[in-house]
């Protein structure tokens, strides 16, 4: 992303992120995990200074585009001048296109192909698979280093039984989107962005242990030095460790 933004700035081009409304692998899987929801991706890109975000519906017709047809579509629809991608980039029907095809078709379609080598950490490639593994094992500090930011969850505050408020500790309950990857059940140190202000706190990931009965997985966050009502308000919880 930073490479694309830097290259665009050097040549006076707008930085456009092209993504899909659902992960392509979701077509064939009933269960899958995402690091960021569509809303969270938009937040990340906006903070980074991306000019435009295109969220394309991943339809059957689109899925069957050949690598060349996919690149041709980008040229015709948004007049792409430069495409920045990693060495593990795949595109087109059945992921038939790679960075090699991206370079091969560049002259014919009139764009510049920029290929970025994967970065490594502790002798291994930094990848979404590796980051998912760290989060799934609860290694939040390691995951955050690989991400370059603190892994976070966004969503509105939901009504609970208000037990925290009765003991003087304001809490915010959140129900993540179905496929959002959560760390294992447990308690985590977090930072909370609420009503435009930053707060420290702790989050419990699990089946809301302060509430009796069986509940779906959720996140219950205790905010330090906060007084107010977060029900229905957008909250960002960043997991630190």
Label for each model-derived stretch:
Residues 57, 87, 205-207:
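Short secondary-structure boundary segments
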Residues 11-13, 50, 111, 149, ...:
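Short glycine/serine/threonine/alanine-rich loop segments
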Residues 160-241:
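Phosphate/ribose-recognition catalytic cores of enzymes acting on nucleotide-derived substrates
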Residues 20, 56, 116-118, 160, ...:
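Conserved beta-strand termini and adjacent loop/short-helix elements that scaffold enzyme active sites
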Residues 64-170, 193:
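Classical nucleotidyltransferase
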Residues 2-78:
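Core alpha/beta nucleotide-donor-binding catalytic domains of modification enzymes
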Residues 1-2, 218:
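Short amphipathic alpha-helical segment that frequently serves as the phosphate-/nucleotide-binding helix
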Residues 14-16, 52, 82, 114, ...:
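A structural signal for isolated positions on well-ordered beta-strands in alpha/beta enzyme cores
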């Amino acid at each position: 992303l930073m490479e694309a933004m830097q290259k665009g700035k050097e040549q006076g081009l707008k930085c456009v992120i092209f993504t899909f409304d659902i992960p392509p692998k979701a077509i064939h899987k009933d269960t899958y995990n995402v690091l960021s929801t569509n809303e969270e991706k938009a937040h990340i890109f906006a903070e980074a200074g991306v000019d435009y975000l295109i969220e394309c519906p991943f339809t059957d017709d689109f899925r069957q585009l050949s690598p060349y047809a996919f690149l041709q579509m980008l040229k015709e629809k948004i007049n792409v001048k430069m495409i920045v991608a990693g060495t593990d980039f795949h595109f087109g029907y059945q992921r038939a296109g790679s960075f090699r095809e991206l370079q091969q078709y560049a002259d014919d379609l009139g764009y510049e192909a920029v290929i970025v080598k994967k970065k490594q950490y502790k002798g291994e490639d930094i990848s979404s698979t590796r980051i998912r593994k760290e989060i799934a094992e609860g290694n939040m500090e390691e995951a955050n280093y690989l991400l370059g930011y603190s892994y976070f969850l966004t969503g509105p505050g939901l009504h609970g039984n208000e037990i925290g408020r009765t003991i003087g500790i304001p809490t915010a309950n959140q129900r993540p989107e179905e496929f959002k990857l959560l760390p294992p059940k447990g308690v985590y140190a977090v930072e909370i962005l609420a009503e435009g202000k930053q707060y420290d706190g702790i989050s419990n990931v699990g089946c809301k242990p302060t509430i009796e009965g069986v509940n779906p997985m959720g996140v219950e966050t205790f905010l330090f030095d906060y007084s107010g009502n977060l029900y229905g308000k957008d909250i960002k919880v960043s997991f630190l460790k």
